[in-house]
Amino acid sequence: MHTPFIVALDFPSKQEVERFLRPFAGTPLFVKVGMELYYQEGPAIVAFLKEQGHAVFLDLKLHDIPNTVKQAMKGLARVGADLVNVHAAGGRRMMEAAIEGLDAGTPSGRMRPRCIAVTQLTSTDERMLHEELWISRPLVETVAHYAALAKESGLDGVVCSANEAAFIKERCGASFLAVTPGIRFADDAAHDQVRVVTPRKARALGSDYIVIGRSLTRAADPLRTYARLQHEWNGGERESTTPT
């Protein structure tokens, strides 16, 4: 988990994943496998990506009763993912159970996968929070509460907007991971996400990792776009033509 860039492999099949990754042959990436791909291909897709030398964020956002989450995480620990997640809204006991499952399922001699919590989806805005989810607190307070709860439950970090990263770090400590989706270049469309930022702004605001999907996976030249991502993250200090 060295590179700060997490590439969202939002594809329906292994064949499309292979096609996208072909230009990056020999370059280890940090990739995200979400529901769409995992539910089609199963654990084999994680094994395939690990064989290719990539780190894997298995983004399934578990949210169920504690024992179910514990048993599920026990299984996911054996799959080989480097990072997994749950919904913080599942509560303290569920998040503690997730860690228990990961500890129990991680093979001897291997580090357990890091586990982070989703605070609020980046498609959630204040109106949706209050009118549809019936949460009366402001969005920023809700995110802060969920982040603190995740920290107290033994998790390694949270998924959050870059705009929330700084105060989460203040509340939970610098080592508590802030993983930020909703990353777009300045000239991209926001699509179905509301709280979006550029790579450069995400770094300035304190994000440890940024998740980039359509801006990269649907680019005409993914390799060049990845280089642009590096360039923006580095504040324009240098630009690489080959991913590192």
Curated annotation (Swiss-Prot):
Listed GO MF terms: orotidine-5'-phosphate decarboxylase activity
Top-level taxon of origin: Bacteria
Broad class of enzyme this protein falls into: lyase
Catalytic activity: orotidine 5'-phosphate + H(+) = UMP + CO2
Pathway: Pyrimidine metabolism; UMP biosynthesis via de novo pathway; UMP from orotate: step 2/2
Active site, renumbered: K61
Alphabetized CDD domains for the sequence: OMP_decarboxylase_like
EC numbers on record: 4.1.1.23
Keywords: Decarboxylase, Lyase, Pyrimidine biosynthesis
Secreted is among the record's keywords: no
GO biological process, one term: 'de novo' pyrimidine nucleobase biosynthetic process
Binding site for substrate: 10, 32, 59-68, 122, 184, 193, 213-214
Entry keyword Lyase: yes
UniProt GO cellular component terms: cytosol
Free-text function comment from the UniProt entry: Catalyzes the decarboxylation of orotidine 5'-monophosphate (OMP) to uridine 5'-monophosphate (UMP).
HAMAP family in the record: OMPdecase_type1_B
Assembly and binders: Homodimer.
PANTHER family associated with the record: OROTIDINE 5'-PHOSPHATE DECARBOXYLASE (PTHR32119:SF2)
NCBIfam families cross-referenced by the UniProt entry: PRK00230.1, pyrF
UniProt protein name: Orotidine 5'-phosphate decarboxylase
Lineage of source species: Bacteria, Bacillati, Bacillota, Bacilli, Bacillales
Gene from which the chain derives: pyrF
